[in-house]
Amino acid sequence: MDSDEGYNYEFDEDEECSEEDSGAEEEEDDDEDEPDDDNLDLGEVELVEPGLGVGGERDGLLCGETGGGGGSALGPGGGGGGGGGGGGPGHEQEEDYRYEVLTAEQILQHMVECIREVNEVIQNPATITRILLSHFNWDKEKLMERYFDGNLEKLFAECHVINPSKKSRTRQMNTRSSAQDMPCQICYLNYPNSYFTGLECGHKFCMQCWSEYLTTKIMEEGMGQTISCPAHGCDILVDDNTVMRLITDSKVKLKYQHLITNSFVECNRLLKWCPAPDCHHVVKVQYPDAKPVRCKCGRQFCFNCGENWHDPVKCKWLKKWIKKCDDDSETSNWIAANTKECPKCHVTIEKDGGCNHMVCRNQNCKAEFCWVCLGPWEPHGSAWYNCNRYNEDDAKAARDAQERSRAALQRYLFYCNRYMNHMQSLRFEHKLYAQVKQKMEEMQQHNMSWIEVQFLKKAVDVLCQCRATLMYTYVFAFYLKKNNQSIIFENNQADLENATEVLSGYLERDISQDSLQDIKQKVQDKYRYCESRRRVLLQHVHEGYEKDLWEYIED
């Protein structure tokens, strides 16, 4: 173990049972390296490591109690969606949605507390209880129900652990003499008995092989809670104390901790990992909902789906949109220009020669048709390069189907291009913070106070909020059926979009001494108007949700 002081989570002796409590006698063990299973050791390593994004304050922030001004969806310290703390976690102030941001070590503490609560009833070693809870997806009630149904042997077999009450008996049966060296069954090198270690199943291997085996499982295969004994055919799981004792690399230990805590978080509907790269913080809510939460790293996301906060579109439609973009966006332009659909099976076909006689390569179709009119090829006779069948009914039907497909593609491209345009603009606007900071410094040199120049930062905050909202309005509009309410929505969208572009233009202008007061007035008026129009748009969409005014196009 590292000599540096780390976080060692242990139960108090009076809260954890001994082996006598489990009905087994305390026995001397030849293996002096065997850990005390009554202590859950997941933390003899610093949880903060450069480049892994773990750390920060110990205490979680209850975001409903923080203050601060409004910020942008992407700006430093900003708060998207109409509120949020300037430098810390933010939230939609009109929504009383309270949450905590937890560090990795706090999640470990939550795990230990969960194990402690269960152990007050079932009285098992902490490492065994952790494996049992993992098997039941950390559902304490299900574990308790199974534990007391009268069939403990079946339960422990399903969880791939040895019944603690048989622990001493198993150790005694597998005690080996230390009088002579013995070969390791993995590397076949001879070592003294003191260099061997193993699990309660009785299979023992040299410590070097154990370390390499565990490192491979953790770092290359990403396994944490399901690492089994390396003996062939043995499915007994390796406990946490054994892993932490046999691994010396702190990076491997840190990865193992993350794998174990990840299973705890993924099984808890009130917990969600921050989706930001290299951030190991977790958001804990009082109840799960599609609401915005902000991590300590500054990332704001939807707690329900984990995507960036996407008001006004719902998670269901955003998920469909993202999938559609992943499938279509890179190839749609090429498909529109170079391919047609088979009039029979609608498989997309590329013409790779000059002849208009097409044969569908779909093994279940094999339709023959004309590339020009999409009608059956048989009536074309010998007109190999000139189609004179434009007026036939079947050819017209095929062309109509093709036109509908093209129209659907053009509609998708219309919304996709505008969605991507606002996304790109949002990235550019994010760079405005550096430019605005420089302008604010220049304005202070022209006899303006620090407070007087804050309108520029506020304007960029509002601009980024509006860009993010507009980006997701095009996802909402793509799936929206036309009706009177959708027309109102599109008018609100157009008004906000126009005002946002004007505000963006103001902020990109060079500010001179002569235009200082004029541009300040224009920027303030315009960002206030943008705030108002954004609020109106969102309120109208939310009212439509409440009154069931929206009808959708199933893609």
UniProtKB/Swiss-Prot annotation:
* Compositionally biased region (Acidic residues): 1-47
Q: What is its EC number?
A: 2.3.2.31
Region of interest: Ariadne domain: 406-555
Q: What positions does the entry give for Zn(2+) 2 binding?
A: 201, 203, 229, 234
The record's subcellular location field reads: Cytoplasm; Nucleus; Nucleus, Cajal body
List membrane-spanning regions: none
Entry GO CC: Cajal body; Cul2-RING ubiquitin ligase complex; Cul3-RING ubiquitin ligase complex; Cul4A-RING E3 ubiquitin ligase complex; cytoplasm; Lewy body; nuclear body; SCF ubiquitin ligase complex
Q: Where is this region: UBA-like?
A: 103-151
Query: Which EC main class describes this enzyme?
Result: transferase
Q: Residues in the active site?
A: 355
Please state how the activity of this protein is regulated.
Autoinhibited by the ariadne domain, which masks the second RING-type zinc finger that contains the active site and inhibits the E3 activity. Inhibition is relieved upon binding to neddylated cullin-RING ubiquitin ligase complexes, which activate the E3 ligase activity of ARIH1.
Catalytic reaction list: [E2 ubiquitin-conjugating enzyme]-S-ubiquitinyl-L-cysteine + [acceptor protein]-L-lysine = [E2 ubiquitin-conjugating enzyme]-L-cysteine + [acceptor protein]-N(6)-ubiquitinyl-L-lysine
- Which of UniProt's keywords are assigned here? Acetylation, Cytoplasm, Metal-binding, Nucleus, Repeat, Transferase, Ubl conjugation pathway, Zinc, Zinc-finger
| Gly residues bias locations | 65-90
Q: Name one Pfam family in it.
A: Ariadne
Q: Where are the zinc fingers (IBR-type)?
A: 254-315
UniProt pathway annotation: Protein modification; protein ubiquitination
Q: Can the keyword Zinc-finger be found in this entry's annotation? A: yes
Annotated Zn(2+) 3 binding sites: 274, 279, 295, 297
This molecule's function is given as:
E3 ubiquitin-protein ligase, which catalyzes ubiquitination of target proteins together with ubiquitin-conjugating enzyme E2 UBE2L3. Acts as an atypical E3 ubiquitin-protein ligase by working together with cullin-RING ubiquitin ligase (CRL) complexes and initiating ubiquitination of CRL substrates: associates with CRL complexes and specifically mediates addition of the first ubiquitin on CRLs targets. The initial ubiquitin is then elongated by CDC34/UBE2R1 and UBE2R2. E3 ubiquitin-protein ligase activity is activated upon binding to neddylated cullin-RING ubiquitin ligase complexes.
Q: What is known of its domains?
A: Members of the RBR family are atypical E3 ligases. They interact with the E2 conjugating enzyme UBE2L3 and function like HECT-type E3 enzymes: they bind E2s via the first RING-type zinc finger, but require an obligate trans-thiolation step during the ubiquitin transfer, requiring a conserved active site Cys residue in the second RING-type zinc finger. The active site probably forms a thioester intermediate with ubiquitin taken from the active-site cysteine of the E2 before ultimately transferring it to a Lys residue on the substrate. The Ariadne domain inhibits activity by masking the second RING-type zinc finger that contains the active site.
The name on file for this protein is E3 ubiquitin-protein ligase ARIH1
Origin species, per record, is Mus musculus (Mouse)
